[in-house]
From Swiss-Prot:
It catalyses: ATP + (deoxyribonucleotide)n-3'-hydroxyl + 5'-phospho-(deoxyribonucleotide)m = (deoxyribonucleotide)n+m + AMP + diphosphate. It comes from Schizosaccharomyces pombe (strain 972 / ATCC 24843). NCBIfam families: dnl1. This is DNA ligase 4. Disruption phenotype: Spores sensitive to ionizing radiation. The active site is at K281 (n6-amp-lysine intermediate). PANTHER family: DNA LIGASE 4. The lineage of its organism: Eukaryota, Fungi, Dikarya, Ascomycota, Taphrinomycotina. Interacts with xrc4; the interaction is direct. Mg(2+) 2 binds at E438.
């Protein structure tokens, strides 16, 4: 099968116009919202679900009778969050509030306007609940008090215009039409539709099941509300087997991992007490890849298309992914659907780094960041016209490993380990904690793929806390954040801080933001906090900054909705998996997986952990070779525990006053990260640095020092973050030791993980460039006999004559292609009979060019372009590229693989003498 199957469904024709919007509100939404979850209605013996089903079914039948079989206009308003056909409106609560201020012609200084602008922190009785606040204002300022004449179709038409609006003025005009045409009751229900949320307490699964028995199943297959309404408009029609499988370019709802069990024993039981697979839970975005005949589509878990970012074909020059995975699939593959996680790859540090903050880079095709998207595949659902969802995970994995024949840091298969015991899981948890990973996913090898379901076939396990940090972090509540949905208007998570240090005579009443915690609270915990702090919460204002410091130049990072005076606050005892670096909090650190241990009513703000105490505790914990942890505190471990060391806050980790043994590290500033290759503790290396004149810092911060070194022996999340800031040189601990032992600062190139000074890095590269390394590469080149496979495109093989200064001469001598800017043309490689050879030539060419200082461009439009390298002899393609160069007014030299190799050999011979 060469082409993707195209699902065709015809729009059913309605015989009359749609029902009135007021009827939709009063006959359907209002009755549904009044039904409780458990209690029976006073006017009916039906239980809540039966009553809701009756209301829905009656209205659906009424629509079919009075309007026709097409219920799509109706379901778009009932399930606005599932409507993928209508684009985003471009606003959330704050933006909608600003638009309604203009639509209602409110004075910006009026109390209602101020409340809408500051809906989270106003003094209104509806603080934190935007929908109710706006409804209250619309009720009091109603333009009309009687039902409007708008139909469901009229509302949909205006919403389509709103989604397509390109200016704020247009949006305001549309909202003003709603304001003038609808009654307060209708506007009340319009607001959640605009925010794409549901406020009538009924799930989409339940609504779809009433609409049609197969609707929920079809939605899991296609994520299209329109298709459901048009394909299943007849309630008596059932889907056949051929219509219940995944299809290429039809976005399905992926299987999700179930939540953790109470303990790992239950996880083993869910696996049937049989061997299971352990996979790393990646920090990225769930993405499904669809490919048919070289055409691609990428979809997120929420059915959003990311094809514009990741690429629509192998030859999409704007793509961040597809143009780099040519040859990744077996040549026999014409159609495929993959399930995986899109993460971020740092090619300089050669590691995966935190994804969320970098997603915008991938979405912006003009971005020139060195970071790249990296698709990590863990499942295959479709292959060459056949659905694989009913196959076991084990079978799907075997197929996947045969399908992907070339892995790279653009796309690869997620590895797994086989386990059978709790100890196997705990061992892997220790590994992911050390690597700063999200956690694990435990999978049943015999399980099939369940579209859109959370099943016990996949269970996620996260490291909930380390014993070393779990009992000792007593943090003070500084502020609170309102929840959403059912938690609107209620504080459901807290900003906690560490107390700034004080002298014995002066208690500091000022704190620095440290962690946001919302997990681990029982009903009773929240009730205690509510009672103890009732009447003491204040809307956020600059007054709070007298008592606390937030991160950010404007002190607005993680800004809470409400704040509380330290003397009125409570201490929370928090447990966590680990301490991690974060610029979102003033301390520059925060907790990973924070959870409440208990509310400490026996402690006051004066007893909260100070910043110095925290760092002393952190350093002491880092001394331990192995920090023990438990997945759940309630599970008793049947082994003897070593008595936990009591950490003394007044014992320094290292002696700052130690007299220097030398001044070889004088005026150099260091931040040391554990673990180091040469020392059991971070403190040991710090001591050596101080003894030899170096200065120690606990964080990189914004020192602005030219010679700041971050000492690290492995790439970690923190190293990646600091590298992205470009504030310091990241170097291995061996450099410190070799410099001390030789009593001189050693050349840094061979020790570097990253240098903030690019020129310095090149110069040190020259220092380390040896004749031996060049000779070895020449030997490898001589072993390649490729000269007969490709005729030369250009007869002129002389190197482009470039004028360079005397100062550059020695530099360019070692890097003969330094002045070259090159475009590597991959067109035609995938269809070449010598595919493997051509890809080998491509990789070697890229290696030679980069090794010798050339710049490689991703497209041919660069004004600096000096050379174009072609790997397939194609006169038509050569003509296309020549015309493109004329269009861009550039005159690069067209060469082939052999030309690059020959010129490099000549240059290398000159260097070697």
């Amino acid at each position: 099968m060469d082409e993707a199957k195209e699902t065709v469904f015809t729009k059913p024709q309605n015989h009359s116009s749609t029902l009135e919007f007021y009827d939709f509100v009063t006959t359907l939404l209002e009755p549904l919202s009044r039904i409780g979850k458990t209690r029976k209605s006073k006017t009916s013996n039906l239980d809540p679900y039966e009553l809701k089903r009756k209301i829905l079914l009656d209205y659906f039948n009424k629509w079919r009778q009075h309007v026709g079989p097409d219920l799509y206009p109706l379901l778009r308003l009932m399930l606005p969050d599932l409507d993928r056909e209508r684009g985003s409106y471009g606003f959330k609560e704050f933006g909608l509030g600003k638009l309604f201020i203009r639509a209602m012609h409110l004075s910006p200084t009026s109390e209602d306007a101020k409340s809408l602008k500051n809906w989270r922190g106003s003094e209104s009785k509806h603080t934190g609940d935007f929908s109710t606040m706006l409804q209250d204002i619309l009720q009091r300022r109603a333009y009309r008090t009687f039902p409007g004449a708008f139909t469901v179709g009229d509302v949909n038409a205006l919403l389509d215009q709103l989604a397509d609006a390109s200016s704020e003025d247009t949006r305001v005009n549309i909202l003003e039409q709603f304001y003038r045409s609808l009654s307060p009751l209708e506007l009340r229900w319009l607001i959640p539709i605009l925010l794409k949320v549901r406020k009538y307490g009924t799930s989409e699964k339940f609504i779809l099941s009433v609409f049609h028995p197969d609707a929920a199943r079809l939605y899991r297959l296609c994520s299209s509300l329109k298709r459901i309404c048009w394909e299943l408009y007849d309630p008596s029609r059932s889907l056949d087997e051929t219509e219940t499988d995944v299809e290429v370019f039809s976005c399905f709802q992926p299987q999700l991992a179930n939540f953790k069990k109470k303990d790992l024993h239950q996880t083993l039981e869910a696996m049937g007490n049989k061997p299971f697979w352990i996979e790393e839970k990646l920090d990225g975005e769930r993405i499904q890849l669809h490919m048919s005949s070289g055409k691609f589509q990428f979809y997120s878990r929420n059915a959003r298309s990311y094809t514009y970012a990741y690429g629509s074909s192998y030859f999409d020059e704007q793509s961040r992914l597809t143009q780099y995975i040519i040859g990744a699939f077996d040549k026999r593959i014409s159609q495929i659907i993959l399930d995986g996680e899109m993460v971020t790859w740092d090619p300089v540090l050669e590691t995966v780094i935190p994804y969320g903050s970098l997603r915008s880079i991938f979405e912006d095709s003009s971005s020139h960041s060195s970071y790249s998207p990296y698709y990590v595949v863990f499942d295959i659902l479709y292959l060459n016209g056949k659905s694989l969802v009913k196959y076991s995970l084990e079978s799907r994995r075997r197929i996947l490993e045969k399908v992907i024949v070339r892995e790279s840091h653009r796309m690869s298969i997620l590895p797994y380990k086989v386990g059978s015991t709790i100890e196997d899981i705990e061992a892997e948890l220790r590994n992911v904690i050390q690597e700063g990973s999200e956690g694990l996913v435990i999978k049943k090898p015999s399980g099939s793929y369940h579209l859109g379901e959370r099943m016990d076939d996949w269970i996620k396990v996260k490291p909930y806390y380390l014993q070393g940090f779990g009992e000792d972090l007593d943090c003070l509540i500084l502020g609170g954040y309102f929840g959403r949905g059912k938690q609107s208007g209620k504080i459901n998570s807290f900003l906690c801080g560490l107390r700034m240090d004080y002298t014995p005579k002066d208690h500091s009443e000022k704190f620095q933001s440290f962690v946001r915690v919302g997990g681990g609270f029982t009903y009773f915990d929240r009730d205690i906090i509510r009672k103890e702090t009732e009447g003491k919460w204040l809307p956020w204002s600059s007054d709070a900054l007298e008592y606390m410091e937030l991160a950010g130049t404007k002190q607005d990072f993680e800004k809470p909705d409400m704040w509380i005076h330290p003397k009125d606050s409570l201490v929370l005892q928090i447990k966590a998996a680990e301490v991690v670096v974060s610029n979102r909090f003033k301390t520059n650190y925060t907790l990973r997986f924070p959870r409440l241990e208990k509310v400490r009513l026996d402690r006051s703000w004066k007893d909260a952990l100070t910043i110095n105490e925290f760092f002393t505790l952190k350093n002491a914990v880092e001394k331990q070779d192995n920090v023990s942890f438990h997945v759940n505190k309630k599970r008793k471990v049947s082994q003897k525990r070593e008595k936990q060391k009591k950490f003394l806050y007044d014992e320094p980790t290292f002696k700052k006053e130690a007299s220097p043994h030398s001044d070889v590290l004088k005026n150099l500033h260091f931040v040391v990260l554990p673990p180091t290759e040469l020392h059991e503790t971070k403190a040991g290396l710090q001591q050596i640095i101080i003894e030899n004149g170096g200065l120690i810092h606990q964080g990189v911060g914004n020192f602005g020092k030219e010679r700041l070194f971050l000492v690290a022996d492995r790439v970690s999340t923190r190293v990646s973050i600091e590298r992205s800031k470009n504030m310091c040189t990241i170097i291995r601990s061996q450099w410190v030791m070799d410099s001390v032992n030789n009593q001189r600062l050693m050349p840094q190139w061979s020790y570097l993980l990253f240098s903030k000074d690019e020129k310095y890095s090149w110069k040190t590269a020259l220092e380390s460039l040896s004749a031996k390394s060049l000779s070895n590469l020449l030997v490898e080149l001589k072993q390649l006999d490729l000269s007969k496979e490709y005729s030369k495109i250009s007869d002129d093989t002389s190197i482009l004559n470039l004028t360079i200064s005397k100062e550059e001469a020695s530099f360019v001598g070692a890097f003969p292609f330094l002045k070259f800017t090159v475009f590597l043309d991959l067109k035609g490689i995938e269809n070449s009979e010598l595919y493997d050879v051509r890809m080998g030539q491509y990789r070697l060419t890229k290696c030679i060019l980069l090794w010798n200082g050339a710049t490689i461009e991703k497209d041919i439009s660069s004004k600096k372009l000096t050379h174009v390298v072609m790997f397939v002899e194609d006169s038509t393609r050569l003509e296309q590229l020549t015309k493109a160069c004329e269009l861009y007014q550039i005159e690069p030299k067209f060469v082939n693989f052999e030309w690059v190799v020959n010129e490099w050999k000549k240059a290398s011979t000159n260097i070697l003498g």
